[in-house]
Amino acid sequence: MKLASWNVNSIKARLPNVLRWLEEVQPDVVGLQELKCVDEAFPRAEIEALGYNVETHGQKTYNGVALLSKLPLEDVTRGLPGFEDEQSRYIEAVVSTDKGALRVTSIYLPNGNPTGDDGQHEKYVYKLNWMAALEKHAQTLLGYEEAFALSGDFNVIPAPEDCYSPTAWEGDALYRPETHAAFRRIINLGLTEAVASSAQTGDDTYTFWDYQAGAWPKNNGIRIDHHLLCLLYTSPSPRD
């Protein structure tokens, strides 16, 4: 099964690119983040015309997440369970595969900046609380004894090799020690971080480049989009 995640930064602006990519790549399940639209404004018909089932958790102007799947999406959950949140950052559903049920997600984890000098700014506290709630929910999912994938834009740079310049990110919410520790606690529940486990880290796995800073031509990227997997069966590659 081919899982994919994409922070589209406005589905309205990126729709032609999304449609072209879906036709070319043919992913089985896709998580989209930063839709920046309410559910009623999501271009459902255009995506369904390509053979995808669609579930959204939208929000006007900001945030918003969606799941697209070639298989029916069942048992849909909107919002991170156990966490009161006015922002639309989490959606979850179950797809039935020939190997059993797979619970899939689309996550748009808070950025967390500014952090404050002491790491106590409300935006950073919100990020850490959100990650703690995700850890708790992952523990719950593990109790179901079914495969699942936590996928999306985590706004976490896991390690020095996941950014073009570690020193440039020191003190940033994406790279603070507290962020690393929270991310590691989630993985240490027994999950597999797909890219890291494939031994293909480095600048060929960056997922974000700041267009305002001209980062793309210089390959000044970072890896902040992740798939954390709980698999009940093995595949030749965690990327498959």
What is each PLM-predicted segment?
Residues 1-10, 101-116, 120:
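Active-site-proximal beta-strand elements of phosphoester/diester hydrolases
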Residues 6-7, 22-40, 104, 137-160, ...:
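Active-site beta-strand/loop signature of hydrolases that rely on acidic residues for catalysis
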Residues 35-38, 42-114:
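Structured beta-strand-rich core segments of catalytic domains in phosphoester-bond hydrolases
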Residues 50-51, 130-224:
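Metal-dependent phosphoesterases centered on the DNase I-like endonuclease/exonuclease/phosphatase
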Residues 61-76, 203, 214-232:
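Conserved beta strand-loop-helix elements of the APE1-like EEP
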Residues 81, 111-131, 169-171:
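Surface-exposed cleft-lining segments at the edges of enzyme active sites
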Residues 233-240:
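Conserved small/polar residues in nucleotide/adenosyl-binding loops
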